[in-house]
Amino acid sequence: MAIELDGVLGDTRPLWRDWLEDAARRFRSIAPLDPDALPADRGEAAAVLDRWAEAGVGDWRAALARFAEDRVPVYLRPSAEVSAALRALTAADCRLGVFTDAPEPLARVALAQLGADRRIEALEAGTGALDRLLERFGPETVVVRDPAALDLQSRS
């Protein structure tokens, strides 16, 4: 089963947007960054941020991970229903993978906060994440994009 992180487990986009604003402020003397000018797809935005970081900002992914670790409890809380569904699916020996367009450091911090990291077999992040996960798990893999569908799958 391929589970969309942001649609099912917890929406990381507000945390991402706040990090972009913080990074733009924090690094403005090194390299200007306009968060509103970045592509909506976070995988594509990561490529732009890689070029931005070459101007002397350094490892933006590590900065994102630190920011997320410090603030993730404010943005994401585990859902009892989703946790129960993941437990049921794991108990039924269902292979679970998570996909997101978010950068991997943000996705990993989110999964840990949500308690899902120990239940999943694979995480694919960035551009083409779903395609990579389906390639890994097989074309017959069920794709889940909302919590209600996850609950239904766990009862099957």
Question: Can you annotate each of these PLM segments?
Answer:
Residues M1-A80:
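N-terminal helical cap/lid subdomain that shapes the substrate entry/recognition surface
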Residues A31-P32, T90-A91, E135-P139:
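Flexible, charged surface loops at secondary-structure boundaries
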Residues D70-V98:
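Short, acidic loop-to-helix structural element flanking the phosphoryl-transfer center
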Residues T100-A102:
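Conserved phosphate-coupling serine/threonine residues in phosphotransfer and NTP-handling enzymes
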